[in-house]
Amino acid sequence: MKQNIYITGLGLYTPLGYGKDDTLKKLRQGESGLKVKSLWEGIPPCLIGELPEVSFNQYIDWKEPFRPTPYSQLFILGCLDAIKDAQIDEKDLESTGCIMETCLGPSESVNDYMKELLFKRKGIISPMKFTRTVSNTALGDVSRYFKLKGPSCILLTESSVSYAYDLIKLGMADIIICSAIDVVTQEVILLKGHDGKLLYNAHDIDKIHEDTNHGFDAWASGCCAVVLESEESLQRRGTKAYARLVSCQERLEGDSVCAPPQITNDYKQFSGNMFYASTLFGLAVASLSIKNGESYHIGEKSHKVKSQEVVVYSKRDGDMSSLFIIDNK
């Protein structure tokens, strides 16, 4: 069983821009990437995050006859940024896996497929177009392009980090790209608008944090990738790590961390970036806790954190929570 697991790479494609460096720079400047705008005809402007245009061909030499969907392109670009940041070469990629997490999946591709099937083609359509509607098509595109041969799978609204942590801990992989991706659709915005959950003024962004009972939210598309790696692989490759992932849990429960977030690290540090990004992107204080050198509890259990460790706890829909402890020395 592997003893130590490290975070060695970050990849980001968000409304703040493409690339880890550009994104974190804007985060430190206090930007969120959210704007009051309408992305679809007939839908009123609301607070939303729009991805900046990035030339897929500029970064990716795609040789297959069928071009990836915009959903897959977003995923490929996010993983590319993480792979470059972790300095993973072609030889190491052969034993690297990828765990993809999504909530909405390729909803836009499904909508386009059904419109063409029902209204344009009248029931006659190429089976190749159906493959673009399957969630794990994006995972296949990434695996083929980067020639990944390690364990890979797709998760729906679960933690890719938790699964990757277990795979490395059990010795089933040395490097795993953990990723989360979603592309917001007009159907989601229409539904949330009908339920009164959207915001229509940029100055109301604080309501996302303050009024957690009402459930105000701002939606955006994006992809985030984190590279987890065993200590043996890290030493063999001679690369540096951001931090050590000490512990990782996921569970169904209803309790939240008892104390509000306290952060003492500079924002240039990994834990500071995580906290700053999470609050800007709309995670409420009750949903996230990052703590240094203090006790915390979940349910009936109490734990003591070492002075150099950071606890990250996030709670998502359905009372599914994730707990990560990061050594930030």
Task: Name the predicted role of every residue range.
Residues 2-13, 18-47, 192-263, 299, ...:
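Condensing-enzyme catalytic core mediating Claisen C-C bond formation in acyl metabolism
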Residues 174-196, 201-210, 214-215, 248-255, ...:
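Acyl-CoA/ACP chain-elongation machinery
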Residues 10, 101-103, 133, 146, ...:
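Fold-independent oxyanion-binding glycine-rich loops
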Residues 109-111, 188-190, 323-324:
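Short, well-ordered secondary-structure micro-motifs
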Residues 6-7, 28-141, 145-146, 154, ...:
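Conserved beta-ketoacyl condensing-enzyme motif
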Residues 75-85, 141-180, 221-237, 274-299:
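Active-site-proximal alpha-helical scaffold in enzymes
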Residues 59-80, 130-131, 151-162, 208-225, ...:
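Active-site pocket-shaping loop/turn-to-helix segments
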